[in-house]
Amino acid sequence: MVKKNKPLIPLPCDTSRAKSREWERVRVRGVLVLFFLILPLTAQTPPVAKKIPKIDSLFGDIRVDNYFWLRNAADTEVINYLKAENEYAAEVMKPTEALQTKLYNEMRRRIKETDMSVPEKIDDYYYYTKTVQGKQYSIYCRKKGDLKAREEVLIDENKLAEGRSYFEVGAYRISPRHDLLAYAVDTTGAEEYTLYIKDLSADSLYRETIAAIDGYMQWANDNRTIFYVMYDAMQRPYRLYRHVLFAPDRKDDMLYQENDERFFLGIGKTRSRKFLLMNLESKTATEYYCLDADNPRDSFRVILSRVAEVEYYIEHNADKFYFLTNDHAKNFRLVEAPVTQPGRDHWRELIPASDSVYLEGFDCFRDHLTVYERHQGLPRLRVIDLRTGEFYHAEFPEPVYSFWPARNPDFNTDQLRINYMSLVTPLSVFDYDLNTRTRELKKRTEVTGYKPDLYQTKRVFAVADDGTRIPMALVYKRGLKKNSQNPLVLDGYGAYGGSSDPYFSSNRLSLLDRGFVYALAQVRGGGEMGRTWYEQGKLLNKKNTFTDFIACAECLIRENYTAADRLVIEGGSAGGLLIGSVVNMRPDLFKAAIADVPFVDVLNTMLDPTIPLTVTEYEEWGNPNIREYYDDIKSYAPYENVKTQVYPSLLVTAGLYDPRVGYWEPAKWTAKLRAMKTDQNLLILKTNLTAGHTGVTGRFEYLKEIAFEYAFMFRVLGIQK
């Protein structure tokens, strides 16, 4: 799918983060440095991090960072501190171990452990994944010609993951003749992948491997040329290489290097298989180059040169390119142009700009375009018949839902495969007939013991300080009484223009069945209500994200869904920034908060260009080397604004190998909170020492993490079972 934002599928969490420039450093002589580390004196005495003041100055503003030293993962004292925090977390949560086991067993029982995906037909093969009872990972398989044919195992993640604490397969690509498989593997969580190529006929790997790629690759149509992308020192994808199997010199050609640090480089292929596409993308602009996939030794040529603040996304059909662009269209418009004359002078508009409809992405097939829109905050599917020019909107059965297209690799199809879910409907795979407008359910994820009629969803709106209506999606068990006694989890994100749509979670049933309400706040900074919604929650408008979330919490309390002493909030990554900010602003409003890999040290990170993602995210948060952005970021950055006050109970998580949010951000924040907060409420830092941004990879290990978070909530709320 051609999509402007990396998909949040299906969880509301980001695929990017934030960072920025070098700052002036003022070293102060004669500072008394406290070189001590208080480890637990008793079973439940929290560790106290030592203070080594690091003094920085910019614009005449002097800042003291006592916990900068935690950034050095090579220092054994840093690792010892993280381990001490983990030991404290385990000790504090020890009374909940039986409850954690109960929750884990509940959640695991709901899973159909032996299962398979809906097969995807590519040429003469059916490709699918399956899981097996008791196994943590997926198995990639195919059958030739017929689903009754012999099964061929392509990748067994369980075997490849043996002996590893972390394992993830990134992208994988079947070669045009279906005899080779290229796939990428990450074994640390640092998101640096190794490319492997497997001979499927011999069931063996080639000796040729390529380390430290970004996880994506594409085949040319000759079946022996593969294109891949390498990182720079800041883990920014910036170089495109061409690798030819069995080439005599074994030296890969570097085809392009992107020197503008705001731009990431990617490689793709049109569904028509005609063109390879090199895309260059910042937060506010894009540029595409194309190459005839039949002639991989040729050079890429630019389609449309980059223009500041102009984005476009491209697909191909016959003699035309299709562009989704914000050129003179804040909410994007769809245009077409001849392949030989793609310039703006030759554009023909198919969908004009609209103030009320936001175009998020599109797919191109031989006879149809499928366009993914948002209208009044809800996703919508528009189908355009390329033979007639007519269009229609598809209908969905529930008032609040989420859907996104599957890969749909067949260019000639008239069946669009879509994934659908809601807060009460498990993941469902449909084939939608683009001609007859009918849909066929191919599979609905089985959830053992689940009865959807027992649960109810509702869409409600809070009102922000400036009068803006903020949508929320709620789910709870039928018969709920609005008596202010219900425990409630309020989830939020609000960044990068990504849309946090309602999603089904079988794990969440362990909350709903205990009387919880779950609420998803679609605050500004996301893209749920269009491009303006995003712009009103970024850069100098970022604080709208936080005040919107506070308005949502106040609304839920005012409407008697819950009370402040029953309200738990959660968010991850950039959503963790949201959590960190609101507990500084309104700690009285929440009983507990869960901040997963939270981006909380915004100012220091955005002032340091040696940290991955910093420069590219100036366009999201602002460049603090400019005074107005410095002042604004400093005014809300959670780490800078920790106060001497009472805080709600907090569970904070981190990943030692996280390349998006450095583990030291949650660690520093926790250390500062311990030193300054005036309460005895729980404060737990749990660092995964063998994973990165997304945490553990095994499906059952993940359940243990969820059980721990739920048990933390239950302990704080006084729920015993």
Language model feature labels by segment:
Residues 22-27:
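Glycine-biased, low-complexity coil/linker segments
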Residues 44-95, 103-104:
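Mature N-terminal segment immediately following signal peptide/propeptide cleavage
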Residues 80-173, 184, 263-316, 349, ...:
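Non-catalytic accessory segments flanking enzyme active sites
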Residues 151-171, 182-230, 234, 239-241, ...:
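Asp-box/WD-like beta-propeller blade repeats and closely related beta-sheet repeat scaffolds
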Residues 157, 199-211, 247-259, 294-304, ...:
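Blade-edge beta-strand/turn elements of extracellular beta-propeller
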Residues 158-175, 183-191, 201-206, 406, ...:
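Cap/lid segment of the alpha/beta-hydrolase catalytic domain
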Residues 238, 243-281:
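Polar, glycine-rich mid-to-C-terminal structural blocks
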Residues 520-721:
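Active-site-proximal cap/loop segments of hydrolase catalytic domains
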